[in-house]
Amino acid sequence: MNIYDVIKKPLITEKTTVEKDDKNVIAFVVNGAANKIEIKAAVEKLFNAQVSAVNTVNVAGKTKRTAKGIGKRSNWKKAYVTLKEGSNVDFFEA
């Protein structure tokens, strides 16, 4: 899989911002077919950062009610990437 297809976007929430500051962990929305090895390679290549661990979570899409009946949002995959000491990804800085 191409490294540009692995990572879709960074996941920026209150929880991920606290984890970035405390534990040097960043979160991404990734392709559902990507595995931990591909995610690690993509982060190291795209952001020039040293990765120590990757944890993934498959998030189930929510069921939503609409005027036409019941629909479902897509399932998606989230990756928590732990960076080694001294490594930093600067897209969180304003």
UniProtKB/Swiss-Prot annotation:
This is Large ribosomal subunit protein uL23. It comes from Citrifermentans bemidjiense (strain ATCC BAA-1014 / DSM 16622 / JCM 12645 / Bem) (Geobacter bemidjiensis). Belongs to the universal ribosomal protein uL23 family. One of its GO terms (molecular function) is structural constituent of ribosome. One of the early assembly proteins it binds 23S rRNA. One of the proteins that surrounds the polypeptide exit tunnel on the outside of the ribosome. Forms the main docking site for trigger factor binding to the ribosome. One of its GO terms (biological process) is translation. Part of the 50S ribosomal subunit. Contacts protein L29, and trigger factor when it is bound to the ribosome. Pfam families: Ribosomal_L23. It comes from the Bacteria. Keywords: Ribonucleoprotein, Ribosomal protein, RNA-binding, rRNA-binding. GO terms for cellular component: ribonucleoprotein complex; ribosome. HAMAP family: Ribosomal_uL23_B (MF_01369_B). The keyword Membrane does not apply. Gene3D superfamilies: 3.30.70.330.
